[in-house]
Amino acid sequence: MHNSEFLSPVQSGTQRGTNRSILNNKKSGKGKKKSVFEAYMTKEEVSAGLKRGELIQGPLRINPKKFHEAYLPSPDGVRDLFIDGVVPRNRALNGDVVVVKLLPQEQWKVLKNDVCEDDDTPGHSTGNKQHALSPHLMKSSAKNPDLIIEAKVDSSAEDGHESALIGCLQKEIKDQDKLGAIEEKTSKQGDPKTFSDDCFQKTAKVVYILEKKHSRAATGFIKPLSDKSSDLARKRALFSPVDHRLPRIYVPLGDCPHDFAIHPETYANTLFICSITAWRDDSNFAEGKLMKSLGQAGEIEPETEGILVEYGVDFSDFPDKVLQCLPQDLPWTIPQEEFQKRKDLRNECIFTIDPATARDLDDALSCKPLPDGNFEVGVHIADVSYFVAEGSALDIMASERATSVYLVQKVIPMLPRLLCEELCSLNPMTDRLTFSVIWKITPQGEILDEWFGRSVICSCVKLSYDHAQNMINHPDKKIEQHELPPVSPQHTINEIHQAVLNLHLIAQNLRKQRFDDGALRLDQLKLTFTLDKESGLPQGCYIYQYRDSNKLVEEFMLLANMAVAHHIYRRFPEEALLRRHPPPQTKMLNDLIEFCDQMGLQLDFSSSGTLHKSLNDQFETDEYSAARKEVLTNMCSRPMQMAVYFCTGALKDETLFHHYALNVPLYTHFTSPIRRFADVIVHRLLAASLGCGPPLKMPKEVIQKQADHCNDRKTASKRVQELSAELFFSVFVKECGPLESEAMVMGVLNEAFDVIVLRFGVQKRIYCNSLPLVNSHFQQVGKRPELTLLWEPEKKGEEPVRQVISIFTLVEVVLKSDNVPLKYTAVLKSPEAQ
């Protein structure tokens, strides 16, 4: 949907939630300019309203493809509050923490199952970033969008919400001047008050912005104002963000290139960064300033920089005051007094296992057999807190960045590269400072003893996951020197090989026990790219294989994180920084349970463990079953909430500490301090608890604030990583396409269906009106959605070919690059061509 609806509602039907009297006033141009938005409440009014329970606060989530729809978590945790329109959103941007006021019940959204097909329940939505309505339907529905009956949707999903509204458009709202009116009824339904509460979704309007979480930066394009003779056009240009959730922005003409006013067409494909500086209550448009020109749209580096700026990722060079916090005498060596304070493990067989390209090696493993048949297993983590003094300029900047950001082509580090890749990185045959957790453990994974402390190690080899996997796959093979990177002469290859095998044995038992105890893992397909060394363009991509060597490392990292969580919580019950994972969202989970029942799928959602077991027991190992499992795993991931950091003193109910997916009472992050600031705080807590570090200066309120910030940056980092992969895949399709693949249907609407492209793991929507069809027909078979396609025959006189599309149908698709930069289309091959 284009931003034209946001800018010129009169041209494309008035938006729901837009007051027509405002529009009429703007058209007339007479008299004083009226306010488009309500004035915000005062801080005092907001504080009093929150205390009385009259107002609700929470993070705002705006639908990426229907920018006039926004959502706020409901206090009851069931169905999100619905903010219907740009005006009720009141200038808040995606991610902002806002305060809302509920609208009267007659303005709530009516939800009804049997009116039209729902695009956000399982089987009807994939959560991918595609329009639910086919393009020609979107045009027709935009003409009169005021009064609709919506299918019963689950508004908690991040990306869906687009309902197929065939035959659902009704007469206009009689009371056109009522702001935010969303009365949805038909003559058959009668008075909305006769419905039960389940038939409604509460609606609200924003009355205050508590915290502007959004960066207020946007990537987009500049263009002249349409009325070039106006005074405004001589002073301003119009900035159109790529992200339609943002308003269009007036920018000073002086910020634009010097020849823009004369030759605007020269910059039609140039990406710019704009910063929003103000948004008055009497304007549909925000005000801002151009920050810089990025380059041509569709090129990797300009697009990447745009993503980073939009999501507030600091990719600037570290300033001198930060670099001054690092050791200045290089090459740096460990001070002699540190050896006296630490356990010396330099003679132990310790090694790293990481991706082949990794340079920030923050964890190492050891496994020594004991005479009694048990093992001494160690997890050794880079001692970042030794170099990052609390309160230093380095500490402050690291806390602000909070996480390293991993793009396809590079890493934006949390810490200066001198630390990430040298002083803290556990590089082979180099003495390094570490924090260790060492267990005495049985082959079955039973822990007999546990030790925490600061240490010094010297890794004997840098193994990749491929190296470790080769050792696991060939337990009896003699690994030759040329098959590995350089190995320390202190340890034999056979010794390392045996240690990997022993770790693998213990890890298998630990993993089995974890899942027997009720853990859940939902693996989704992840794309990896190979890049051309000269151009940096993607020359290949494949789905990453998660193998036994990955699982080996994961099990011991989990074990260390859980052990440290219990330790610091015992010592600091009010100040411990832990990580919790709330259970799935109730409404979405109930929808998924209903869908599985309709599809005859025997899944048990009663706990994380039963879900994991039933999901894995449901399918065989053939390719079709694997594809079905992938579709179902994707559906199961949608109700899941994000895991979050928190300070134990901020939550009084200890049951809320629980980690749903791991099914453990306490968990934290300890094992990646080079790339996560939360781990640095945990290291400080651990050091303080052991008496080998200074007391922590941060009170629990500050720890909670830092935890919230880490959560925000983690979310942003995850999204940036996804967008980077999407960017590279779009370029890959352009450079190497068209690409053919098998795909499986994972959602069916009445004019479109969603597929997961099995070769690449991407999700796309295919519209019926883009196919050479005689016609298409949607129906419910029982409660299962089904779309029948009648293809135009290839030769005259032949009968149309019939194809039935339903959940789990296998189809053949072709991915083709569009003319628009970074866009590609999935085209369904006709049954005759398959």
Curated annotation (Swiss-Prot):
Mg(2+) binds at residues 354, 363. One of its GO terms (biological process) is miRNA catabolic process. Residues 1-23 have a biased composition (Polar residues). It is found in: Cytoplasm; Cytoplasm, P-body. InterPro entries: Dis3_CSD2, DIS3L2, Dis3l2-like_C, NA-bd_OB-fold, RNase_II/R, RNase_II/R_CS, RNR_Ribonuclease, Rrp44_CSD1. GO terms for molecular function: 3'-5'-RNA exonuclease activity; metal ion binding; RNA binding. Its main location: cytoplasm. One of its GO terms (cellular component) is P-body. Specifically recognizes and binds polyuridylated RNAs via 3 RNA-binding regions (named U-zone 1, U-zone 2 and U-zone 3) that form an open funnel on one face of the catalytic domain, allowing RNA to navigate a path to the active site. This is DIS3-like exonuclease 2. It comes from Xenopus tropicalis.
